[in-house]
Amino acid sequence: MTTRRNFLKAAGAAALTPYFALPKARAESDTGRLRLASIGCGGQGRLDMSYFDKLVDIVALCDVDSNFGIAETLWCGYGRKEGDKVIQPDTYSDYRRVLERDDIDAVLVATPDHWHTKIAIEAMQAGKHVFCEKPLTLTLEENRLIREAVHKYGRVFQVGTMQRCFNNSFMIAALIIRGGYLGEIKNVVIDIGGCPTSPVIPKAPVPESLDWNMWLGQAPLVDYIASDDEGNTPWEPAAASFPAYSRCHYQFRWWYEYSGGKFTDWGAHHIDIALWAMGRQNPDDGPVEIDGRDAEHPVPYKDGYATVDNQFNTATRFNIYHKFADGLVMNVCDSSKDGNGILFEGTKGRIHVSRGRIVGKLIEEGIAEQFKEEDYIALNNGIPFSPETNDRETQDRAFYEHKYNFIHCIQHGGKPVSDVDSHVLTANMCHLSGIAARLGRVIHWDPAKETIVGDDQAASFMHREQRKGFELPEV
């Protein structure tokens, strides 16, 4: 009997080979469906693939952890369909081998955040369309670089913020606000939750299945650290085979070296919805002042950097105030009386919206009933929804519609619902929140020039030095 544990052990051992033999390229899919490769096969990658598998042929998997990434994904049974058979995807440990294949149409980039920009740009340079998980980038500099690449190489590029497809909450909020039913929006409160803390995490042997040097990528070369205990995460309830505390796997989110804590983890969702709902879609729609004085971190900081390197270091409590030239104030906070979600306060009323829930007087009066299918399609950049079902009232359907939107744009043209230009504005605000919080002061931003002004130290956080061999590509 093949148990899940035995399958993972065998598959993980096989996947330890650095590079797999490159298969003979096929000019087109045997099934007529697009061919997709997933670069990054952790929890988010597998979640995305569970929806893509209904729409495309998944022909390649790549992950630097042969056990947790590759083997877990093979267990899920995704692959190329031949009648009733499923042909397993080819597996790789180096994403460059995937990009060399001329029979792959698109790639899913579901790696940790510090790898997004390099892989996404190189994928577009190789002629691939890209579905890049959120947050878009690691730094402000990367925002501009990836936007330039999308426009230069002309590939379809979708950011993995599926909340724009939530028909039962966020889309209704956008229709209300864009329709002027709340009047002029004066105040927005964005509750994204605070980051977890960790104990001191000891040095540990690097797992045999993990290429630690490759996982670190552009980030500084540091020791692998991990706790002895194993733990579940929201995305990995069945994969409790990795440490509860470490630098990688799900826990990379809580280190500024690789991510931005909740500012980028949930900020990429809720800040995005706040801006999108108000129709603020261009980088020059951004704030002019970001106040980070009310923020706390779990470890000591000096000059914006953690003074210890063996504990989670992203902000646990915060109220980051973004002030706009027109008087709008947006508070990005870890906690609010309304809970996780977005509160919009206008001159005519207010609503609070989160995943699967929207409340306010207008909602009680039944305003959502007046919105028609064409209103939702307009929010979807004119791209029709999947013809397979009219039920878009669940989160599951929203995840699917977001992937369908990407594939439809590849096949028929059009601007994806989560396009790069609007997401640069979102990512700018996410990173500015982190910089202001790390320095604990007010910083000023020039939205038109996309730069921090009057503060050389804060401006130095706009970019990072990449480790030799992992530099960002030229565009």
Question: Model-found features: residue ranges?
Answer:
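A generic secondary-structure signal for well-formed alpha-helical elements
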Residues: 15, 56, 128, 147-150, ...
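N-terminal glycine-/serine-/threonine-rich beta1-alpha1-beta2 phosphate-ribose binding loop
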Residues: 1-132, 141-156
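A contiguous active-site-proximal alpha/beta segment in oxidoreductase catalytic domains
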Residues: 129-131, 137-217
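Glycine-enriched catalytic-core subsegment of oxygenase/oxidase enzymes
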Residues: 48, 62-70, 76, 266, ...
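Rossmann-like dinucleotide-binding domain that binds NAD(P)(H)
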Residues: 213-326
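Core domains of carbohydrate- and sulfate-ester-processing enzymes
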Residues: 189-243, 362, 463-465
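NAD(P)-dependent dehydrogenases' Rossmann-like dinucleotide-binding region
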Residues: 40, 181-199, 211-213, 217-225, ...
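Non-transmembrane alpha-helical segments in soluble domains
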Residues: 8, 49, 96-99, 108, ...
